C-alpha cells in the first residue's frame, strides 16, 4: 500500500511539472518602428503595453562604439506636447545652453548646438559618457509633429 501511495504521489508531481514549466513567459507588450526620419538616423518607436502606448525616439549615436540613444516621449498626447516644446526651445536657445528633460522617471540632458547650420539638440541618456549622445534636429522634430498631426498615429 505504501508503494502505491508513493507511485501515485510521484505521478501527480510529474503531471504538474510540465504545466509549471510552460507558465513562465507572458507577453507583456510589443514594440514597433512606426516611421524613420532624417534618412533613417531617427526612428519613431511605439511600445504597446497593458497600460497603453508609449512613444520614443531612437537616435543614432555619435560614437560607433555605443548603442543608439533611446529618448522616451510618453503617450501620444504627451509626446506631441514634448516635441512642440523642443521645437519652441530650439527657436530661442542660444549656443552653449543646456537643458534637463525629465520623463517617466528618467532625466535626459539636452545641449543646444548647430551642425552644418542646422539647429539641433545633442541628447545624452541617463548615466551615459560624454561621447555617448544622439542628435535631434529641429527639422526632424517638426517632421515628427507633422506626422502625428496628419496621420493620427
What residues fall within each predicted segment?
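Bacterial Sec-dependent N-terminal signal peptides
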Residues: 1-26
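Positively charged, low-complexity terminal tracts
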Residues: 21-153
Amino acid at each position: 500500500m505504501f508503494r502505491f501511495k508513493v507511485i501515485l504521489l510521484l505521478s501527480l508531481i510529474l503531471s504538474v511539472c510540465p504545466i509549471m514549466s510552460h507558465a513562465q513567459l507572458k507577453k507583456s507588450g510589443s514594440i514597433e518602428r512606426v516611421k524613420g526620419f532624417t534618412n533613417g538616423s531617427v526612428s519613431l518607436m511605439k511600445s504597446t503595453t497593458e497600460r497603453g502606448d508609449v512613444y520614443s525616439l531612437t537616435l543614432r549615436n555619435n560614437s560607433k562604439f555605443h548603442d543608439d540613444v533611446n529618448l522616451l516621449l510618453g503617450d501620444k498626447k504627451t509626446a506631441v506636447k514634448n516635441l512642440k516644446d523642443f521645437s519652441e526651445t530650439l527657436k530661442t536657445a542660444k549656443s552653449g545652453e543646456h537643458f534637463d528633460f525629465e520623463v517617466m522617471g528618467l532625466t535626459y540632458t539636452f545641449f543646444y548646438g548647430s551642425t552644418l547650420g542646422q539647429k539641433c539638440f545633442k541628447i545624452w541618456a541617463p548615466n551615459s559618457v560624454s561621447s555617448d549622445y544622439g542628435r535631434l534636429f529641429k527639422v526632424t522634430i517638426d517632421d515628427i509633429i507633422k506626422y502625428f498631426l496628419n496621420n493620427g498615429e
